[in-house]
Amino acid sequence: LRLIEKRKSVEGVENIDTLLASERSPNIPTASVDVVLLVDAYHEFSFPRDVMTGVVKGLKSSGRVVLVEYRGEDNNVPIKRLHKMTQHQAKKEMSAVGLQWLRTDDYLPQQHVMVLSKL
């Protein structure tokens, strides 16, 4: 987080906030964010439902979640299975916390970039 804050300062970026999450909460104020970007992180959460419920609570009504995960459907991606996620799995788990899948962008060679919104 310090590196991001330093780079924001150097480049004069004002529209990015960093927050230190806990194991069970993203610590996002209610209805305060436009986008939550999770890169190769979701599958590591010890309490994914708790964290994602907090993410949804923190999204503005038009907010989005961008979930980037290694393609679980692709056996050619040289990552252990526990560090991958299928689109089907992501859609199921995200819908359980109040998110709906909008699209998947596949411009990265080994990862899905899944875009979701509040239901």
Regions found by a protein language model. Give the residues of each.
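A short beta-strand submotif of the Rossmann-like class I SAM-dependent methyltransferase core
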Residues: D34-V39, V51
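A short acidic, Gly/Pro-enriched loop at the edge of an enzyme's catalytic core
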Residues: R24-V36
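A short glycine-rich, Lys/Arg-flanked "PGG" loop and its adjoining helix->strand segment in the class I
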Residues: R49-R64
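A short His-aromatic
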Residues: N27, A41-E44
